[in-house]
Amino acid sequence: MNTPTLNTRRLILRKFNENDLEAFYDIFSDKEVNQFLPWFPLKNLDEAKSFYQERYASIYQKKQRYAYAICFKKNNTSIGYINIDLDESHDLGYGLKKEYWHQEIVSEAVKSIIQQAQKEELNYLTATHDIKNIHSGHVMKKAGMNYCYSYKEHWMPKNIQVIFRMYQINLDGKNGFIKNIGINMNILLKKTYKGQVI
């Protein structure tokens, strides 16, 4: 299925549409929200429309995808996003407007999308976070994801070196982790970052 609507206690997870463009722009233009993401903040509504067409509208034409707007039930206004890429990594990603941080909104959305992925027989999901983005790691742990390893990557288009932590959850009851998820990486074993083992 392609992004079937999901309901949680507080949220509706649904497809983005063109009526969301102003809220979409608010999400993807905020420097803090997009600090740890692989794109630059959007500059105007025209960029938002192009970004929406490229990353959402086009994939809604596919047979199976998970590309959600996170909305409150009370007003159905989009306040964030949550996606699963269906490449080899099955990478889970999310973002939320900063005024809604620290309310466990993303955790609620993650729980729902994991349940949907399991229902549709995805065997596993992975997720990564910049080592500096501690709160994203907390979301992954709370969702039952297990830390696998850390790696360093030269990140484009921002042209910076980033240390990532990779997590995985197996949805098929099997143990172990996916060793090759199709990225060029240097595994970092028993290294430290600011005194902490990564």
Where are these regions (language model features)?
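Conserved GNAT-fold acetyl-CoA-binding loop/helix
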Residues: 32-54
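Polar/charged alpha-helical tracts
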Residues: 16, 46, 58-59, 158
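Acyl-donor (CoA/ACP) binding surface of acyl/acetyltransferases
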Residues: 1-35, 69-198
